[in-house]
Amino acid sequence: VTSALEPALDSFNCRRTLDVDGQAYDYFSLKEAEANGLIGIGNLPFSLKVLLENLLRHEDGRTVTSDDIRAVALWLQERKSDREIAFRPARVLMQDFTGVPAVVDLAAMRDAMAALGGDPQKINPLAPVDLVIDHSVMVDAFGSDKAFQVNVDKEYERNGERYAFLRWGAGAFDNFRVVPPGTGICHQVNLEYLAQAVWTREANGGDALAFPDSLVGTDSHTTMVNGLSVLGWGVGGIEAEAAMLGQPISMLIPEVVGFRLTGELRDGVTATDLVLTVTEMLRRMGVVGKFVEFYGTGLDNLPLEDRATIANMAPEYGATCGFFPIDEETIAYLKATGRKKSRIALVEAYARAQGLYRESDTPDPVFTATLALDLGSVEPSIAGPKRPQDRVPLARAAEAFAEALDKEYGKGAEADLRVPVKDKNFDLGHGDVVIAAITSCTNTSNPYVMVAAGLLAKN
């Protein structure tokens, strides 16, 4: 029986070898596939090229056929498709809230295997799984340099049994790692440590196999890692378990909306202001079930941390993902976050060989639809009062708050009401800022907005 992780066919004769600093890697060449019948695929959006490579690598004649592969090339004709394909992500990302049931299921499968007289040690994830413990923290202490340690200690006290179980799972199962509490939000850990941009594994009877990093995760903001050119999005627990066991994710070949960025952000304008503007534009267009891919000369002026902020909010603008291609900034970020030199060399060499590397003069891909934004036009903004996708220009903050107080909450008559605070020498009224907290996974990997939030909290 052919493994779900090892291809049986190569209908387009595109399996080649790439040498990087003396290390040989097998890979499925998109350029060779184009030369061997997949005409025009060099014009595909970068995100669809990643999907296409995934199909070429997993062609088995059953879950992935040559017609499925041709359908991606034919997407260029109508710039959309009703073809359903089987996508196998390279890995799975979980957090402790949804990940514990998955580990319980694996343990139950081992019990069942033992009851049937088989070897329970054969039950393991086929795709690599990283479970980041981040959803159990509670803020008991704050406003102190000791707050972090106090909160971590209480977290261990409250969740000792769960954490002991996960620690057992990390030791018992192959292909399963647990990132301990207090390390960071799972999407931050994924972006800064786990993601590789190009993944490798040992191939059966050959050199190591190189392919684009991709994943599904059990949290909607898994999309953050698309800022690092890693295709991924959030799925339900059952789908994640299926992917963990080597089963494909069924999906339609998506429409891809191209979002052209030009210019650069003005001083004092942050990635938060930008992402609120992008979200407003994309929600107006309607991108549910679609990929969004960012392109244009503005990418040359957009740090990877800002790209990750934009990619993170894909659930808020409704897209499956917001993808950024590999370029010079991607390589610089991998270096800055301490990835291995050999991996960084592979990422650049592989991306260039596959036509997955963006440069300033790279021709624009073909998209289903496009829209554009001059980064210089973005203005300072806030969100709310209820939903993160509701952008309010900072200049309109007072006016927007007064409107919301009256229309949303029916308290317009109390706008000027002040209430003395017992045992304090101040009073409070509607509109006063009483809590300043840095909590969102959207911001935790962006030092610029972290500093801005800290200054706001301080003042």
Set out the residue ranges of the language-model regions.
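Fe-S-dependent hydro-lyases/dehydratases of central metabolism
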Residues: 1-459
